[in-house]
């Protein structure tokens, strides 16, 4: 960041953070050092735990409260795994956060421990209608609220940069949003019915559904698109999302794993040479399918 700012020649007026969403970092608040490797959004090590929970009465509660399905993709079982299998002893000094919280903590030298609803809504711990951490879900997964970040509006005051960085201190951090919601906003999808689809590692289609929390739709996720703080008046916009875990990553696998192509553009030539698939299809379910099958 310092190299980019130095080349620009001016300090920014404000900083915004966008990030991959469900990835979880655990760190010590006193030392600001991680206490375990991050568990990324594609990590499926808690699959059995999720299958066990699906046999309980928790499934409909999670669906209606968080807007999500019970899947290892989301952060709750990752945090639970870090506590139980990663042997992280809970204390007031332990912090769990998505990547935005970790970046914010470091940019402010530990003075700000916060997130926004677009990230909180991906943890499977957050009530997307009441806009708060859900006590029942915290108890189920053995997590205490003091170990989680405060949830602030997506556009608002999160803190200021500290003197511990090589660029100027005192730059306000005024926005946080998960990457897919930031993409929806960046494409000016401001009206209900507006949608975007991102093709990257996976593919993620989000549609703005307005300011009413949507009822669950089979195969899709209900999520927070963004919250806006307009001089103390908080407005929330919701979205429906379809998440496909592996699309572009499959092309990367063909290149780097199977090595059947040297560069991505070679794939088009191979595809055009094939007159028929003979009913053979490739389903890139390397980390599960995502929508609509889960």
What function would you assign to each model-found segment?
Residues 47, 54-66, 72-113, 119, ...:
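Active-site core segments that coordinate phosphate-bearing ligands/cofactors
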Residues 43:
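Carbohydrate-associated surface elements
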Residues 20, 153-160, 180-183:
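Short acidic loop-to-helix transition motifs that present clustered carboxylates
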Residues 19, 40, 176-178:
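Hydrophobic transmembrane-helix microenvironments that flank and shape a buried ionizable site
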Residues 1-36, 64, 93, 167-172:
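N-terminal glycine/serine-rich phosphate-binding loop of ATP-dependent small-molecule kinases
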Residues 148-157, 268-272:
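Short linear loop/turn motifs
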Residues 140-147:
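A structural motif corresponding to the C-terminal end of an alpha-helix
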């Amino acid at each position: 960041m310092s190299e980019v700012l130095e080349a620009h020649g001016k300090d920014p007026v404000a900083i915004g953070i966008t990030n991959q969403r469900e990835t979880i970092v655990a760190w010590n608040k006193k030392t600001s050092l991680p206490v375990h490797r991050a568990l990324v959004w594609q990590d499926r090590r808690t699959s059995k735990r999720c299958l066990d929970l699906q046999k309980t009465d928790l499934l409909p509660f999670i669906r209606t409260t968080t807007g999500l399905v019970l899947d290892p993709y989301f952060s709750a079982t990752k945090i639970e795994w870090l506590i139980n299998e990663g042997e992280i002893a809970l204390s007031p000094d332990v912090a769990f956060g998505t990547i935005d919280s970790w970046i914010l903590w470091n940019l402010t030298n530990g003075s700000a421990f916060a997130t926004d609803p677009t990230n909180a809504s991906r943890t499977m711990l957050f009530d997307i209608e009441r806009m708060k951490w859900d006590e029942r879900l915290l108890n189920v997964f053995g997590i205490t609220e003091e170990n989680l970040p405060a949830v602030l509006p997506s556009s608002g005051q999160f803190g200021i940069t500290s003197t511990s960085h090589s660029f100027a201190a005192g730059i306000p951090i005024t926005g946080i949003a998960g990457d897919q919601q930031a993409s929806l906003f960046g494409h000016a999808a401001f009206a209900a019915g507006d949608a975007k689809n991102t093709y990257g590692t996976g593919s993620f289609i989000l549609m703005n559904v307005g300011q009413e929390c949507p009822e669950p739709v089979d195969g899709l996720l209900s999520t927070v698109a963004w919250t806006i703080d307009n001089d103390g008046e908080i407005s929330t916009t919701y979205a429906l999302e379809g998440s496909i875990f592996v699309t572009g990553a499959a092309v990367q696998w063909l290149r780097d794993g199977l090595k059947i192509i040297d560069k991505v553009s070679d794939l088009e030539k191979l595809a055009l040479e094939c007159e028929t698939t003979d009913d053979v299809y490739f389903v890139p379910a390397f980390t599960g399918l995502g929508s609509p099958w889960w």
